[in-house]
Amino acid sequence: MAEQEGLQYGKADFVLMDSVTLPEFMENLKLRFEKGRIYTFIGEVVVSVNPYKNLPIYGRDTIEQYKGRELYERPPHLFAIADAAYKAMKRRCKDTCIVISGESGAGKTEASKYIMQYIAAITNPSQRAEVERVKNMLLKSNCVLEAFGNAKTNRNDNSSRFGKYMDINFDFKGDPIGGHISNYLLEKSRVIVQQLGERNFHSFYQMILGAPEQTLRSLHLQRDISSYAYTRSLAQLKSSNNDAGDFKEVAEAMKVIGFKPEEIQTVYKILAAILHLGNLKFIVDGDTTLIENGKVVSVVADLLGTRSEQVEKALLFRTVATGRDVIDKQHTEKEANYGRDAFAKAIYERLFCWIVNRINDVIDVKQQDASLHGKNTVIGVLDIYGFEIFDNNSLEQFCINYCNEKLQQLFIQLVLTQEQAEYQREGIPWKHIDYFDNQIIVDLVEQQHKGIISLLDDACMNVGKVTDDMFLEALNKQLGKHAHYSSRKVCATDKALEYNRDFRIRHYAGDVVYSVVGFIDKNKDTLFQDFKRLMFNSSNPVLKTMWPEGKLSITEVTKRPLTAATLFKNSMIALVDNLASKEPYYVRCIKPNEKKSPALFDEVRCRHQVEYLGLLENVRVRRAGFAYRQVYDKFLHRYKLISSLTWPNHSLPSDRIAVERFMVDCGLNHDAAYGKTKIFIRTPRTLFSLEERRSEMLIRIILFLQKLWRGTLARRRCKRIRAGLTILRYYRRYKVKSYLREVMHRFNGVKNSRDYGKHVKWPTPPRVLRRFQEALQNIYNRWRGYQIIKSLPPAEIPKVRAKVAAFENLKGHRVDMGLQRCWEGSYLASNQENARNSNQFVSRSNELQRKDKFMQALFSCHVQKVNRFNKVQDRAIFITDRHLYKMDPGKEYKVMTSTPLYNVSGISVTSGKDQLVVFHMKDNKDLIVCLGCSGQGPYDSRIGELVGVLANHFKSERRPLQVTVSHPIQCRQHGRSCSITVETKINQSQPQFTKNRAGFTLSVPAN
């Protein structure tokens, strides 16, 4: 029951009234209307009073207040009933429907739009693009259908002139995935004639008043509704409709839905063609019927994609087939006018049906496999014309009111009859509540062979000329004694009925007088085949698809089509069966006054609606009855998890006993009754309490299941990881063994080969053995080197080590390292190198050995040296394991300077073929020399030998020696930095130092 509203607003639920009487009901309804509370509950039924003004109660904030809430938690609202239908559909996977009923102008169409708005707002929390697209198109379809199916009447500015039932399909998550729209009985007669003060369909005015000038010119239209016969009745009538703005909104909606530009243009052409058809006038010249304004025919032909002579022939002649002969029968003026109007009505009806089908093509649910996507559920929303009583009521009003009788019958059967019958069947104590059952009125209309529709069909099928008077006579004869039928002939004293024209039906909503004038023609719904062929042969493909029967041959005999009333009756029976298969929710709309005033509450008018809608009886049944009932096994299946007595399964003798024990255990036994097969729960609060407890337990069970499932997944994952690691371990072992076998196979016997396996290509190792292969290659290289070296004489081994040291320090940096020649070491002691002075050098060397006690002479050579005065001198260098001696070859190799070898920190050379060497000293007195520049011996490359000998010696003594290859070479002399560059000269025979600003330049021969 509704809460959170103060007593100053009256009772939010009529069930809470102190006494169930009509005066108290009306007093509460009036109070709530005056306080701006237009919605009131009757249990799970919403009573809605049209406020005739915009209220700020439909925004996003209001939607959030009702989302996921139970009925009793919030004040009465359309959103509450919409949410209840949505939750029922989602919780129980059962199709639901919302039936909106009430008379014309009671606010049914607006109610349906707010319900659609709410459903769209609360779904698709994950913002899936496809769901958003479907929601948008469902909402936009309302705008389009209102434009082409609604009109202004004297009772309603936006009256639905057709019946609409929309199914919204939801996936298993509760998100809309599509829908389907069914339309019923478009009031197409409104196209050609409207009652005083009423309008044609909105679409005509929207196009005339809202279309751009260029569009109007292409349609041969003027921005003047009084220029067209079919809209002229509104010329001086003021309307609250914003037609120009609505035109843009409808055009945009059609684009969003998916109408192609050429399809939208065709729609405008059809509307324009209908307006021009209405302006066609016929005249009689002797026995010939002619068209007075022939130019209009050309315009119509152009708009419909046909030739003007074909249009003219269809309007003036009717093709009749007699056997094999085909003749053209000319119309009289009356027949021509009838044919023109019938053609205009048919075109508009086909257009409307095509629009509905076009929308359905877009929003229909595509075929889905229920095993993959889950079961689709449906919420149906019925927005259909309300009960109508006009000054002149014809076949359209008769069908509309019959529709309302069927819906009232459904309400009675589901809410009143079936509910009370179920209580008696289940053995629940119950005091019967009387109500008016309108089945007798439904039978009066639809009964086979005896009902009004059957009698109307019989009249239409009779051979010869049958008039409306003859139909009325048949009604009087067959139904004269029926309690709900009357006519002037049946009741001669009733002067409100005109003789041979009117009959009265006592509907559940009141007495309605119908005029039989036009019943026969409207029921036959005659449209000459010539018009169908004309449209089928149109060059416009959209128009062609609207008239498929136009392809039939002129001489082909066709089956008599069902009449308009029978088609409508069949569709209503199917609709009611469809609604009865779903769980219904009701919105009962009430019209507060006839003046469309937001402040006036016409108590007499409202009381009449309350009475014929059966709202008071609804309150009595709801107050005395039960809000919820369910068979025992399904009840247990949903709620057994709440109690330990029933979870996971009970051991009691029957489900009924288990349910009784369950309700006692939950402390809710006071609000339940137990039938033979079902449990009945009186108040919604008890049901909501069960739902809350179930939701709480679901969380615990879900967590428990998640724990078990996550544990299972973790164990499975652990097993897979262990299995994977085992496989990986064995695979690695296999790869290692395969690799080692391949290495052993390839290097088998390399010890006996000439190059010790240098030519053998190493196999590609597994990733895990890459570092191992690098180490193995190092071991192999050391072994191969040992194999090569061990065959050398002991005296050659130091030279080999020196060459290795030179290679390690100069590889990739210097072009010529002299590795291919034999290294002499002490070139000054060589007779070949120093034939004239070698004895002098040997003598000086022996003297120094005795003096300095060195163990080994490493290197000696003539050099060109730059002294401290930046002068170039010929000198010799002698390097032992202890000192670096600088000697003067001109003075019998007199020692000029002796530098301890530990004072040498590094040497620098260039990358070219020159013999420039810089000895870097720790005291910054670097020695700059060019090897082999004395002119006493052949010129060759000794840089590699010098670097190798020194590097190998320093390595053996575990001292660092920095070897630098650069150009220019940077050095320091007497504390100053200088730079030495090397350049090549063609016409120079010997290397030569020259002074420059930065230091020195060494010029070397080109060859």
Curated annotation (Swiss-Prot):
SMART domains in UniProt: IQ (SM00015), MYSc (SM00242)
Keyword Repeat: yes
Residue span(s) of domain Myosin motor: 9-695
Actin-binding: annotated span: 572-594
A GO biological-process term: actin filament organization
Residue numbers binding ATP: G102, E103, S104, G105, A106, G107, K108, T109
Cellular-component GO terms for this entry: actin cytoskeleton; cell cortex; cytoplasm; dendrite; early endosome; microvillus; myosin complex; perikaryon
Pfam entry (one): Myosin_TH1
Chief place of localization: cytoplasm
Keyword annotations from UniProtKB, A to Z: Actin-binding, ATP-binding, Calmodulin-binding, Cell projection, Cytoplasm, Developmental protein, Endosome, Motor protein, Myosin, Nucleotide-binding, Protein transport, Repeat, Transport
Lineage: superkingdom: Eukaryota
InterPro entries found in the cross-reference section: IQ_motif_EF-hand-BS (IPR000048), Kinesin_motor_dom_sf (IPR036961), Myosin_head_motor_dom-like (IPR001609), Myosin_TH1 (IPR010926), MYSc_Myo1 (IPR036072), P-loop_NTPase (IPR027417)
Phenotype upon gene inactivation: Morpholino knockdown of the protein at the four cell stage disrupts body left-right asymmetry at the level of the heart, gall bladder and gut. The left-right organizer, a transient ciliated epithelium of the gastrocoel roof plate, displays abnormally short cilia and disruption of the normal cilia orientation toward the posterior pole of cells, leading to disordered flow direction and reduced flow velocity.
GO MF assignments: actin filament binding; ATP binding; calmodulin binding; microfilament motor activity
Domain IQ per the UniProt entry, residue ranges: 699-719, 721-741
Domain TH1: 812-1006
Similarity comment: family membership: Belongs to the TRAFAC class myosin-kinesin ATPase superfamily. Myosin family.
Domain remarks: Binds a calmodulin chain via each of the two IQ domains. IQ domain 1 mediates interaction with calmodulin both in the presence and in the absence of Ca(2+). IQ domain 2 mediates interaction with calmodulin in the presence of Ca(2+). The TH1 domain is required for activity in complementing zebrafish defects in Kupffer's vesicle lumen size.
Role noted for this protein: Unconventional myosin that functions as an actin-based motor protein with ATPase activity. Plays an important role in the establishment of left-right asymmetry during embryonic development. Required for normal cilia orientation, and for normal, directed flow at the transient ciliated epithelium that functions as a left-right organizer during embryogenesis. Plays a role in endosomal protein trafficking, and especially in the transfer of cargo proteins from early to recycling endosomes.
Protein name as catalogued: Unconventional myosin-Id
Species annotation: Xenopus laevis (African clawed frog)
